[in-house]
Amino acid sequence: MSEFTLEPLYDYPQREQVLALARTHASAVDRGERSPFENLREIAKDGLITLGRDGGSLVPQVSVAFDLATEDASTAFSLWAHRSTIAFFDAVGRELPEGLADATVSGTTAMAAAYKEASGLAPIKVEGTLVEGGLKLNGSVSWASNLYPGGVIVLPVAVQNAPESHPNRYIVTVRQDVEGLSIDYHRNLLALNGTESGTLKFEDVFVPSEDILSDNIEAFLHDVTAPFLLVQSSFCLGLAAGALQEAAKHLDVSQGVFRPEFPLILTEYQSLREELVRLASEPERAERRDLLSLRLGVSHFATIATHFELQVVGGAGYVATSPTARRLREASFLPVQSPTEGHLRYELARYDHLENLRDAL
């Protein structure tokens, strides 16, 4: 008999409470009736959203995101965006804005455009003009999440009037309710309705000089990519693990016809799990190619795992409000989450191309 035990990536004293909290409120969060930040504020009391800030192992932090996602991917997603925002301030040696460490203030990463421009896929769409005392911002960010009143947003800006030979790409922070910033919220999503996602529109938004976090975007991205992708990958894998846990209960369906596939799926799961732990153990040494490959791999695997769960659970899993259906919907978001499937495949193809060139030479 094939079995699956949901083992922690890293065991910590509050793990059972984290799982129970996520399980209890998963349906309400999915319906948009409860904010994921209500869950994050609970676990923040035990310091579980600020783990690994000393520059050491990220395994404890990715473990929390993984565990949340086995029961509720929306809360795990919100943790990823919030924890990434914390990492942005840490990368430039800034103190965290008040409320970020305990999740009484939300953190929003609007960094997709920075990664896209760095890869040659698309330009940064928020433009900045240097003015006395800071910058004026105009433009838009097509998608960001955790958009709560008073929240902290970090984003890249293309500076239009930077002096010659000076940097013209900045990383800045603004508050969600700053004058000139409007939000068009995305409602009735296929999944993750509780994540307060929307489009940001900037119209002459003033950013004081002290809120410019960096004018070295290349170095900034280098420093934040590992925590950004590792916590993201962990909740993708946690979502898949939740599907496998449920699927394992139904392997005798249809006279066990699906049973031979399960060990093969578990082998891939174990491989991805080991790679996640390896990279998170020493994030500063993680190679970018490995991080991108892991992120793409766990996204694909979540799709495989959730579809397998639906196959073995059967009609009960097709009920829209069931945990099986919720996981299937949540997994459908992963290919469009930044970095998108297209972005990941494009970057990895470039690595392959360079490798082929080296081999040819």
Task: Locate the predicted segments by residue.
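A short core secondary-structure module
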Residues: 143-181
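Glycine-rich flavin
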Residues: 34-140, 145
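C-terminal helix-coil-helix/basic helical segment that borders enzyme active sites and/or dimer interfaces
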Residues: 23-30, 52-53, 252, 270-300, ...
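Generic structural signal for well-ordered, non-transmembrane alpha-helical segments
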Residues: 238, 263-270, 292, 296-303, ...
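Acidic-glycine-rich active-site phosphate/pyrophosphate-binding loop
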Residues: 59, 130, 210-218, 314
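A generic N-terminal leader/anchor concept
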Residues: 1-55
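Glycine-rich beta->alpha junctions and the first turn(s) of the following alpha-helix
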Residues: 187-270
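Glycine-rich phosphate/cofactor-binding loops in nucleotide/flavin-utilizing enzymes
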Residues: 316-361
